[in-house]
C-alpha cells in the first residue's frame, strides 16, 4: 500500500535480452515490436555480449516511437570470473578482466552489476566462493548489486534453489530474467518491483524490494533456439568471408536502421 492507502503499482522487467549483435536471433526492432505487442513488460534491458551499440539503438528507437516499455542500456560482460550484467551504462565495459575489477568499473560508470546465471559449475558463471570474497570486502564498489536468481534456461534450472538461498543469505536483491536469445523466450523470466519505470526498478534493487518470477524452458524450446543460433552463425560467417562484416562488427545487420534517432552516439560502437 502507498502512504495514501492506494495499492502500489507493480511493474515488470526482463533485464537479460540478446539481439543479433551478439548471439541472439532477432533484430532490435523485432524485439521492441514483440515486447510491445506480446508482453506486458514495463522495462527491458538489452544485454548483448561485450557490446552496447544495439542497446543504445533500442533505447533511441523506443523513445522515438513512444513505446510502452522503457529500455535500459546494458551489456553482458565476459569477465575472468563469469558473465556479469552491467545495467544503466553509457559506455562499453571492457571484457576479460577480473570479476572484481569489472564490477568496480560498472559502479564507477554509474551502473549496477548483476552476476548472470551464477553458481553454476561452468566457466561462464560466477562461483559462490568468489562472490562471498567480494561481499566480504569493505569497499562496496566491489559488491554485486543483485543476483540473477531466476534464469529459465538449462544452465540456470538445476541450480535455481541454491542461487535463491545464496542471495537471501547474503542480503542481495533477487531478479528474474529470460536470458532470451529468441523472440518467444522474452518474458519467460521477469522481475516484479514497486512502480513502473527503470528508475523505480533501480530503487527497488537497492532496497531489495524485487521479486523474481518465471517458468523454465522445455528441452525442445532450447533445441529450437540453438538451431536458430547455428543458422545465424552460419550467415555471419558467410558475410564475414565475403568482407561485409569488418573486425569491429560493423556491416552486420543488427535489425535496426543505421541512424534510428538523434541520441545514437559514437561511444556505442563495440
Model regions and ranges:
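Flexible loop residues that form catalytic
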Residues: 49, 118, 152
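Charged catalytic cores and adjacent phosphate/nucleic-acid-binding surfaces used
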Residues: 1-15, 19-37, 41, 53-59, ...
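Hydrophobic/aromatic-rich structural module bridging two neighboring secondary-structure elements via a short loop
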Residues: 69-75
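Aromatic-lined carbohydrate-recognition surfaces of secreted/lumenal glycan-active proteins
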Residues: 114-124
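Conserved beta-strand positions in the central sheet of alpha/beta enzyme cores
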Residues: 45-48, 114-115, 148
Amino acid at each position: 500500500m502507498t502512504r495514501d492507502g492506494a495499492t502500489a503499482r507493480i511493474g515488470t522487467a526482463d533485464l537479460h535480452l540478446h539481439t543479433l549483435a551478439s548471439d541472439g536471433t532477432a533484430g532490435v526492432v523485432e524485439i521492441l515490436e514483440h515486447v510491445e505487442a506480446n508482453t506486458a513488460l514495463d522495462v527491458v534491458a538489452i544485454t548483448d555480449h561485450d557490446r552496447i551499440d544495439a542497446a543504445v539503438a533500442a533505447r533511441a528507437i523506443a523513445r522515438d516511437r513512444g513505446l510502452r516499455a522503457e529500455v535500459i542500456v546494458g551489456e553482458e560482460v565476459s569477465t575472468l570470473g563469469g558473465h556479469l550484467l552491467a545495467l544503466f551504462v553509457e559506455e562499453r565495459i571492457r571484457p576479460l578482466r577480473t570479476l572484481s575489477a569489472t564490477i568496480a568499473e560498472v559502479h564507477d560508470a554509474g551502473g549496477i552489476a548483476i552476476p548472470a546465471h551464477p553458481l553454476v559449475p561452468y566457466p561462464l558463471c560466477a562461483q559462490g566462493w568468489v562472490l562471498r570474497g567480494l561481499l566480504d570486502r569493505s569497499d562496496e564498489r566491489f559488491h554485486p548489486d543483485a543476483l540473477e536468481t531466476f534464469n529459465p534456461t538449462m544452465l540456470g534450472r538445476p541450480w535455481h534453489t541454491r542461487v535463491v538461498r545464496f542471495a537471501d543469505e547474503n542480503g542481495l536483491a533477487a531478479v528474474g530474467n529470460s536470458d532470451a536469445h529468441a523472440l518467444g523466450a522474452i518474458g519467460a523470466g521477469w522481475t516484479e518491483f514497486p512502480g513502473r519505470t527503470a528508475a523505480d526498478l533501480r530503487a527497488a534493487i537497492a532496497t531489495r524490494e524485487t521479486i523474481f518470477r518465471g517458468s523454465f524452458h522445455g528441452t525442445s524450446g532450447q533445441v529450437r533456439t540453438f538451431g536458430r543460433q547455428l543458422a545465424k552463425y552460419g550467415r555471419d560467417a558467410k558475410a564475414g568471408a565475403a568482407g561485409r562484416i569488418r573486425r569491429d562488427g560493423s556491416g552486420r545487420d543488427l535489425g535496426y536502421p543505421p541512424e534510428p534517432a538523434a541520441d545514437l552516439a559514437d561511444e556505442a560502437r563495440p
